[in-house]
Amino acid sequence: RYTQSEQTLDIDFTKPFDVGLYEPLFVATGFQYRNESYESFAGDTASYEIGPLATQGFGIGSNGFPGLAANSQGRVSRNNIALYIDAEAYITENFMLAGALRYEDFSDFGDTTKGKIAFRWQALENIAFRGAFSTGFKAPTLGQSNVRNVTTAFGTGGELIDRATLPPTDPVSQLKGGEQLTPEESESITFGVVADFDNGLFITADYYNIELTDRISTASGIALT
């Protein structure tokens, strides 16, 4: 079995400032500390040892899902801290501007700073335009970096085969070119229009363009011979 736990401490502050704009500048800032742990536990010995039906082509374990072997169990953990600041204000009666910055430092992936800028313009009494540009960062979870499991399935010729999901740092993965996972990063652009009519009709239309790099997923099947 697998368990993943997380403990988080957040400290947040918000305050409006009168800086001579149409409305006060609202500022939010804060700090976050997060600790994550991932632990895998070995199954019953009979669930992963070779059984008496191995000579008939059956894999180890029962129901096609072998238990986790004792040499595969373990515990990993990491922590990260984050600092952020977010500001928003109506520059004029009809134009709102917002911006945000977030800094994070991971014990296993280093640090990064990402941001966002957004606006809303009330062009007419019942029509407004809005848009935003932001950058994103997502570190692999401890489960994604360390999960292991094996299932038994039928191959293309009807034979029984074992299919394994292995972490990229496993010797078998490295033999086939596996490397340590890297964080996902993204850039996002949005633009939209909002129309609110007196007869109760409310219309929104938004365009989204999200570019994601280093997306994390399982590899296609790799045969071992």
Spans of model-derived segments:
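Flexible, surface-exposed loop regions and adjacent strand-edge segments
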Residues: 1, 43-53, 115-118, 146-154, ...
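Outer-membrane beta-barrel channels and translocator barrels
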Residues: 18-22, 92-94, 122-126, 186, ...
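Outer-membrane beta-barrel transmembrane domain signature of Gram-negative proteins
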Residues: 1-96
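Transmembrane beta-strands of outer-membrane beta-barrel proteins
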Residues: 25-29, 97-99, 115, 129-131, ...
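Residues that define the transmembrane beta-barrel architecture of outer-membrane proteins
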Residues: 3-9, 77-81, 111-113, 175, ...
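Transmembrane beta-strands of outer-membrane beta-barrel pores
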Residues: 17, 33-39, 81, 101-107, ...
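Residues on the lipid-exposed face of transmembrane beta-strands in outer-membrane beta-barrel proteins
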Residues: 11-15, 83-89, 117-121, 131, ...
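Outer-membrane beta-barrel signature, preferentially recognizing the C-terminal barrel domain
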Residues: 72-78, 126, 137-204
